[in-house]
């Protein structure tokens, strides 16, 4: 099979796929997965300005360094936001056990007693809001497009967001070079 013939076959198959999709789906339709979830039950934890929030990304934090799961308060880190302007480094968390961390307390990344941070002394915790999109397939411009799972912090210091949530597409040409 020569390159020209292969290109013709790919074009024919794409056109058939596009026609089937156009018949069944509206442009931008969700085909498989891709559920959108708003979560206003997450909590922010402000750290002291000398700490780096990204060290805790996607980890589990605890109020004790003894062993994994031994802390009385444990939380899954949903998002870690480093120091931005006058905003302190902030962790967005979902509690596993307990309901809050004490102001000024030291937190530990489970499985690493060396990774610690100190919670800010004032205005250290409160409600936040995030939106998540699960992995899914959408029909866009005649193509079935895979969308990776994503989480976005809507309001890091409020659990009452006022946004419209959606996806945008970026088209690019990928070649062999």
Language-model regions: role of each:
Residues 1-177:
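Subunit-assembly interface segments of extracellular/virion macromolecular structures
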């Amino acid at each position: 099979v020569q390159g020209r013939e292969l290109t013709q076959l790919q074009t024919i198959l794409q056109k058939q796929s596009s026609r089937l999709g156009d018949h069944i789906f509206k442009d931008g339709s969700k085909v498989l997965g891709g559920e959108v979830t708003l979560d206003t039950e997450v909590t922010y934890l402000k750290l002291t300005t000398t700490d780096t929030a990204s060290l805790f990304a996607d980890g589990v934090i605890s109020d004790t360094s003894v062993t994994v799961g031994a802390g009385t308060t444990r939380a899954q880190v949903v998002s870690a936001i480093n120091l931005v302007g006058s905003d302190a480094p902030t962790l967005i968390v979902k509690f596993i056990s307990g309901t809050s961390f004490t102001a000024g307390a030291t937190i530990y990344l489970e499985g690493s007693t060396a990774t610690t941070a100190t919670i800010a002394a004032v205005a250290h915790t409160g409600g936040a809001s995030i939106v998540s999109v699960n992995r899914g397939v959408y029909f866009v411009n005649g193509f079935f497009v895979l969308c990776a799972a994503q989480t976005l912090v809507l309001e890091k210091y409020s659990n009452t967001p006022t946004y419209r949530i959606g996806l945008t597409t970026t088209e690019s040409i990928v070649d062999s070079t």
